[in-house]
Each structure stands twice: as C-alpha cells, then as structure tokens.
C-alpha cells in the first residue's frame, strides 16, 4: 500500500467523520481502513488510539455527549440516570461542575479509562424494574431539549426512582430529599406504571412517603388505580450506609 493511497484515505476520514466523538474499527472499515492501517495512522499521529479498537482524531477535545453516544451503541440500556438525569431536566441541588455523572445500564460494565479520565462518572447496574414490555423501558428514556439527538436520559419519573434506590448508599438521604422536593408535575400515569414494576421496595416506599409529605401526587388515588409494589404489610427497616435508620410504612 503506497503512501499516496494512505494519504487519500485519511483525507476521506477527516472529511467524512464528524468531530466530537470517538469511533471504532467498524466505523473505520466503512472508509476502507483495516485494523492494521488504523494502527499505522495512530503510529503516524493521524489518529489517537484511546483503547483497543477505539480511536479519535488528534486534538479533538470531544465532549461528554459525543462520548456517551459512542458508548450507548455498545452498552445495552446505557443512559444518564438518577441525579444527573434530573439535573439535565432542571431539577438540581448544589450540583458541582466536577460532580460524577451517574450512568445506568442493563448489564455489568466497567466504564473505560479514556472516558472516566475525561469525565468523572460512575456506572450503576441494578434490576430496578421488571419491565412488562420493552415499550415502557423505551418510553421512560428521553432526550431533553438542547441535547444531541438520540442521547438517552431517564425521564424524571424514572430518574427519581433511580435516585431513591441509591439514597443512603451512593446518594445522601438529605440531598435525595432536596432533589425530590424540586420535582414538578410528574406524569401520574407514567409514575403508576413505573411503581407497578419497580423491584425495589425501598425506592417505592420512600417515593410514597415523600410524595405524601410534599403532596407531589395523590398517593391514595395512585395506590387505588395501580398495582404498586409496596411489599409486605410490615414496616421496611434498614440501617443505611450513612448510619441512618430508615423505617418506611407500606403505603407511605
């Protein structure tokens, strides 16, 4: 393969691939770039090798959203969740600029070093919902206004249950309550559906308790209309990682 051909290919890459995100060997192959040629380009400084099979253009300071969309193609169910999802939709409490981004996904996954070195983040994998079908799972992921197309973010109704699942563990109970207090006009039908398939008794009961205290929704009407998973008829009690003894009644 002569140098002129390699130069032509890299020119096509530079013209055809948008800046702002990494790319992989599958994408490079669409431009006629083999793994060997990609390695050659990396050795020559035309590409930067981020990890095995993952590249970017040199001096391309790609942003978190481009990187997330790249990971979304590889990690089932990956989305911005919990506190981070609420913040992107206007519900925030003293959010620091370097605060770790909360990401959720459907399976075990370790965020790659090239991502976490640029964007402080943590990944949560938990079976929080027993989805009755894929439609509800998809319907509760959205792209808030102003964000790149197809970037997946948990809708507020889903994000708050992700937040409450982590309350007292990775998320302080006090901040969780402050964020909960910032919720406005949740969609009651969507909430009812989510509470009916939420597998965390703690998250469900904490939601019902705080919803009663804040009058966020009519809890009794919600319980009457939907088969909300509240667990047994006894109190749910647990000492959280932060030392708090949490005691929750079945219906809030």
Functional labels for PLM-detected ranges:
Residues 1-84, 184-203, 251:
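Short beta-edge/loop segments at beta->alpha junctions of small alpha/beta modules
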Residues 43-45, 56, 99-105, 225-228:
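Short linear loop/turn motifs
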